[in-house]
Regions:
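An acidic, low-aromatic, low-complexity terminal/linker signal
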Residues: 1-151
Length: 151
C-alpha cells in the first residue's frame, strides 16, 4: 500500500534554464527569486563565486552554477535571475540562472535516477531526470551541490 501511495506522491520544482537545458530546483529549497542586481565581488574565492548581494539587510553569497558545473560563463540578460536557496543549515545562497521558466509538479513515478559518466560535470549536481510535457528536466541535487561551504 505504501508503494502505491509513494508512486502517486508529487514534488514541485521550479524549472530554470541554462542555455537550452532545463533544470529543476525542488521548491522546498527556494526561499526567493530576485531580479539581477549589483553583485559585490569578493577577493580570493573560487572562480564560481560571483560575490555577495544585500537582500533586505542580509548579505548573501551568489554563485554561478554554470561555472561550478563546468559550463560556459554566465551571460547576463533581462531574464537573468538569482534564486535564493535556503539550505538545510538555514544558510542562504544565491544562484544565478539564465531564466526562471515555470513551476511544475512531477509525480515521483515520473522521476528517474540517472548515472552520469564520472567525467560528466553534471554527475555531482543532478539527482535525476523528470519527464514533463515539454521534455526532460535535469533535477538538481541541492544538498549534494552545496555540501561544501561556499563562502
Amino acid at each position: 500500500m505504501n508503494e502505491i501511495r509513494e508512486q502517486y506522491e508529487t514534488t514541485q520544482f521550479i524549472v530554470v534554464k541554462y542555455g537550452d537545458e532545463q533544470y529543476g530546483v525542488d521548491i522546498k529549497y527556494v526561499d526567493n527569486i530576485v531580479r539581477m542586481q549589483r553583485i559585490t565581488r569578493v577577493p580570493k574565492v573560487q572562480s564560481y563565486i560571483k560575490g555577495v548581494i544585500n537582500l533586505r539587510g542580509e548579505v548573501i553569497p551568489v554563485i554561478s552554477l554554470r561555472l561550478k558545473m563546468g559550463l560556459d560563463e554566465d551571460v547576463i540578460t533581462k531574464a537573468t535571475r538569482i534564486i535564493i536557496i535556503k539550505l538545510e543549515t538555514n544558510e542562504c545562497i544565491g544562484v544565478l540562472v539564465d531564466e526562471v521558466k515555470e513551476v511544475v509538479t512531477l509525480e515521483n513515478a515520473m522521476i528517474e535516477k540517472v548515472a552520469y559518466d564520472s567525467k560528466d560535470p553534471r554527475a555531482n549536481f543532478v539527482s535525476g531526470v523528470g519527464k514533463e510535457r515539454d521534455g526532460l528536466i535535469s533535477l538538481l541535487d541541492i544538498p549534494g551541490t552545496f555540501a561544501e561551504k561556499e563562502a
